[in-house]
């Protein structure tokens, strides 16, 4: 009597096994990523008015095409910072988008079959209305889970998407793979674009948002979850609202891949080899495939999956990631041709941009190069500070609360080698006629001018924070020592404050880290700080012209909401252009000479010091250094990235 049930049970098991085996399949899936394109659609440097092989989506597109041809199944995503960042973006923002007009970035990207895009922090630079008009031109959807609409309390954008994606397995059979995409942006956008966003949106923590939504995506049937955070990679201990949250995302259960960006760096690469859990050879972070493909289209992110469903559901069995460059820095050769179709699509807007940046604004008496802007007072920063001070002094006339306060200005070198990843990224403005192209070269970002009210003590601490740019020099060592703290400090945080005089003693330890957090309360690098020839009064009150990013950040002493004196509606770049025009009308030309209000302090040592500084490798830079360097400098060759290395003598 037990024979029949046993036979039926065995038969059922065999049928189930046969069905499972018949349905079992292995699928290869490639996920491609672009990020931080910053409107660099063309392979063209509008600041120099010359073609380039080193960036531009028209070249990345060729890598995209090749990567797709190599794969049976592929999808393409973009990670934002798209509509701002090059003269093409400036051109479109200046003229505005008419109803139904498509932004050039989407004219190009709509031809490449993107599956989805994420919102970057720079998408908010021109306000929510302009962003909405721009996004309307995209033929692909957008996701972002942590930007919250104040009115509704819900995400402003679609938080995630699950896309039914047809794929072929290794036997050529068709399947449906449900790919989930979720996007995130840095919470700091509420500081950086405070004027555009306050009262309209809030931004939640990236990691906590992921923990909320990823289980929901799995519940809704996502076979694969691809996170697209506009956020960088840091292994610092977790902090709520961290700007760079990718490491913590890699520890969130349910995420299968991280396509990240924001930091303008390349992962996997040796730059991240020391991070615990980072497998540079495999391209994984805590076992999760992750990729960050640089900036401006100079790399394409590639994640390759092998998925298998022999257990009845799709599971990742293998995964690896890489970032493919469009240019070989070692051989100085292009690795990607121009995409002819994109060149055609962009032709009219490209010419419009060239015409836009060629508008004359004035005349300069001398060249303005930023080759030495990190180590001495410099004309490219000086002219910005001059413009900001002139604007502020004019603005406060007649104001009973502000008119009698002394005016200072803070500005930083925006183009001084990038993040030590671009030996060509320096300001190069020639004397003679100046155009808007030159103003954009001198002031890279569409920031607005904001004036803060700060004490003399704040000025000192502000400068101490800026001085974290330098490594501490050991005066008892004769070994080569690198002067610039490239790893932990961004040059756009190296504020020069004009209107005061001071020296920076790099033999002393830094008081603050690269994020302006106090690390040594006994350290002092700023020496001989004076105002009008006298030691600065810590109790005195000053107005400091700066930009919205710095003013609202609260990181530097003297910044934050409580210090705001007034917020101008004008962009710093427009202020600079107007200053150049006014000076030209008044004097026939603008004179961009550094006033040398700061310098590196002379170092005392019993032996010769070998201090190294990196800058442009061009012959133009070498000649400029020969003529303008305030310290003796000796060329020592080039480093592996291509920067010229100089030995700088701070003992004289």
Swiss-Prot record:
* Gene Ontology MF terms in the entry: 2',3'-cyclic-nucleotide 2'-phosphodiesterase activity; 3'-nucleotidase activity; metal ion binding; nucleotide binding
Q: Which reaction does it catalyse?
A: a nucleoside 2',3'-cyclic phosphate + H2O = a nucleoside 3'-phosphate + H(+); a ribonucleoside 3'-phosphate + H2O = a ribonucleoside + phosphate
Q: What keywords is this UniProt entry annotated with? A: Hydrolase, Metal-binding, Multifunctional enzyme, Nucleotide-binding, Periplasm, Signal
Q: What is its main location?
A: periplasm
Give the UniProt subcellular location, in the record's own words: Periplasm
* Superkingdom as given in the UniProt entry: Bacteria
Q: Which Gene3D superfamilies match?
A: 3.60.21.10, 5'-Nucleotidase, C-terminal domain
E.C. no: 3.1.3.6, 3.1.4.16
**Sequence positions that bind substrate:** 445, 549-555
Q: Which residues bind a divalent metal cation 1?
A: 36, 38, 81, 264
Q: Which residues bind a divalent metal cation 2?
A: 81, 121, 230, 262
Signal peptide limits: 1-24
InterPro entries from the UniProt entry: 5'-Nucleotdase_C, 5'-Nucleotdase_C_sf, 5'-Nucleotdase_CS, 5_nucleotidase/apyrase, Calcineurin-like_PHP_ApaH, CpdB_N, Cyc_nuc_PDE_nucleotidase, Metallo-depent_PP-like
Cite the CDD domains for this sequence: MPP_CpdB_N (cd07410)
What's in the GO CC field? outer membrane-bounded periplasmic space
**What are the BP-aspect GO terms?**
nucleotide catabolic process
Q: Which cofactor does it need?
A: a divalent metal cation
Which Cys-Cys disulphide bridges does the record give?
A: none
Q: Which family does it belong to?
A: Belongs to the 5'-nucleotidase family.
PANTHER family linked to this entry: 2',3'-CYCLIC-NUCLEOTIDE 2'-PHOSPHODIESTERASE_3'-NUCLEOTIDASE, 5'-NUCLEOTIDASE-RELATED
Q: What functional role does this protein have?
A: This bifunctional enzyme catalyzes two consecutive reactions during ribonucleic acid degradation. Converts a 2',3'-cyclic nucleotide to a 3'-nucleotide and then the 3'-nucleotide to the corresponding nucleoside and phosphate.
Which NCBIfam families does the record match to this protein? CycNucDiestase, PRK09420.1
The protein depicted here goes by the name 2',3'-cyclic-nucleotide 2'-phosphodiesterase/3'-nucleotidase
Organism, scientific name = Yersinia enterocolitica
Q: Which gene encodes it?
A: cpdB
């Amino acid at each position: 009597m037990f024979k029949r049930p046993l036979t039926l049970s065995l038969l059922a098991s065999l049928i189930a096994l046969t069905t499972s085996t018949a349905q079992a399949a292995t699928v290869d899936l490639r996920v491609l990523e672009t990020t931080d394109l910053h409107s660099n659609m063309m392979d063209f440097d509008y600041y120099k008015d010359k073609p380039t092989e080193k960036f531009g989506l028209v070249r990345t597109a060729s890598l995209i095409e090749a990567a797709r041809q190599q794969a049976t199944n592929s999808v393409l995503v973009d990670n934002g910072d798209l509509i701002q960042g090059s003269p093409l973006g400036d051109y479109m923002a200046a003229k505005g988008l008419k109803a139904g007009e498509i932004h050039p970035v989407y004219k190009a990207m709509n031809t490449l079959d993107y599956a989805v895009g994420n919102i970057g922090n720079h998408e908010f630079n021109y306000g929510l209305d302009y962003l909405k008009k721009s996004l309307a031109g995209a033929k692909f959807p957008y996701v972002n889970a942590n930007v919250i609409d104040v009115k509704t309390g819900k995400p402003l954008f679609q938080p995630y998407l699950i896309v039914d994606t047809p794929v072929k397995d290794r036997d050529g059979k068709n399947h449906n793979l449900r790919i989930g995409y979720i996007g995130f942006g840095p919470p700091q956008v509420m500081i950086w674009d405070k004027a555009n966003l306050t009262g309209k949106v809030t931004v939640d923590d990236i990691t906590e948002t992921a923990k909320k939504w990823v289980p929901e995506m799995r519940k809704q049937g996502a076979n694969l979850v691809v996170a697209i955070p506009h956020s960088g990679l840091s292994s610092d201990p977790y902090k709520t609202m961290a700007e760079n949250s990718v490491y913590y995302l890699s520890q969130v259960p349910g995420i299968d891949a991280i396509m990240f960006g924001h930091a303008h760096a390349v992962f996997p690469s040796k730059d991240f080899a020391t991070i615990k859990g980072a497998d540079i050879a495999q391209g994984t972070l805590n076992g999760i495939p992750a990729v960050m493909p640089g900036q401006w289209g100079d790399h394409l992110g590639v994640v390759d999956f092998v998925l298998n469903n022999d257990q009845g559901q799709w599971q990742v069995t293998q995964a690896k990631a890489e970032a493919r460059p469009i240019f070989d820095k070692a051989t100085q050769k292009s690795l990607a041709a121009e995409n002819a179709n994109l060149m055609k699509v962009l032709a009219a807007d490209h010419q419009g941009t060239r015409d836009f940046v060629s508008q004359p604004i004035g005349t300069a008496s001398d060249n303005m190069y930023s080759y030495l802007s990190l180590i001495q007072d410099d004309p490219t920063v000086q002219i910005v500070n001059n413009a900001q001070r002139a604007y502020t002094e004019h603005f406060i006339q007649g104001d009973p609360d502000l008119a009698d306060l002394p005016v200072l200005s803070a500005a930083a070198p925006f183009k001084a080698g990038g993040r030590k990843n671009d030996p060509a990224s320096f300001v190069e403005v020639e004397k003679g006629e100046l155009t808007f192209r030159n103003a954009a070269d001198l002031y890279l970002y569409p920031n607005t001018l904001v004036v803060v009210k700060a004490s003399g003590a704040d000025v000192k601490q502000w400068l101490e924070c800026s001085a974290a740019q330098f490594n501490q020099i050991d005066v008892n060592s004769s070994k080569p020592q690198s002067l610039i703290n490239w790893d932990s400090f961004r040059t756009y945080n190296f504020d020069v404050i004009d209107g005061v005089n001071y020296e920076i003693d790099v033999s002393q330890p830094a008081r603050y880290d690269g994020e302006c957090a106090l690390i040594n309360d006994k350290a002092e690098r700023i020496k001989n700080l004076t105002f009008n020839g006298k030691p600065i009064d810590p109790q005195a009150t000053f107005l400091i012209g700066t930009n919205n990013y710095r003013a609202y950040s609260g990181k530097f002493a003297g910044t934050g909401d409580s210090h705001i004196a007034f917020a101008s509606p004008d962009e710093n770049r427009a202020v600079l252009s107007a200053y150049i025009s006014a000076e030209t009308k008044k004097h026939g030309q603008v004179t961009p000479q550094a006033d040398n209000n700061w310098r590196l302090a002379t170092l005392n040592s019993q032996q010769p010091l070998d201090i190294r500084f990196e800058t442009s490798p061009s012959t133009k830079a070498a000649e400029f250094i020969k003529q303008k360097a305030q310290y003796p400098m000796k060329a020592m060759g080039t480093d592996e990235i291509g920067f010229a290395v100089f030995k700088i003598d701070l003992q004289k």
